Amino acid sequence: MPEGILDTSTVILLDRLADSSQLPSTPLITSVTLAELAVGPLVAEDQLVRARRQSHLLFVEQNFDPLPFDRDAARAFGVVSSSLRRSGRKIAARTYDAMIAAIALSKN
């Protein structure tokens, strides 16, 4: 599988994946995923969970160069969001996913 953008939930589970053969050969992440991961340690109430999340965030920061949410992605976000609204879905619940999708669309 060539390069591909990983969703935040996949990035969270990277160190626990038993079979990475289903991942792209060149995994990519977005700045949105990095932002989501940055929230994790800050909202963790348990110190062990906070430390584990912080360690994972540092690992991701050191091993990935995130694709930015730039002007092209912003335009694509309009397309994704309007499509969600037309289908009757609430965009607020899917904003991060829509932003990641917009970055992916803008890179094609």
Give names to the regions the model predicted.
Residues L13, V39, F59, A76-V79, ...:
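Residue-level signal for well-ordered alpha-helical scaffold segments within enzymatic catalytic domains
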Residues M1-L58:
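Short, well-structured N-terminal submotif of metal-dependent ribonuclease cores
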Residues D65-N108:
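Active-site neighborhoods of divalent-metal-dependent phosphate/nucleic-acid chemistry enzymes
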Residues Q22, F64-D65:
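A ubiquitous short alpha-helical element
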Residues G40-A44, V60-F64, L84-S87:
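Alpha-helix C-capping/helix-to-loop hinge sites
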Residues S55-V60, F69-D72:
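Short hydrophobic interaction/assembly module
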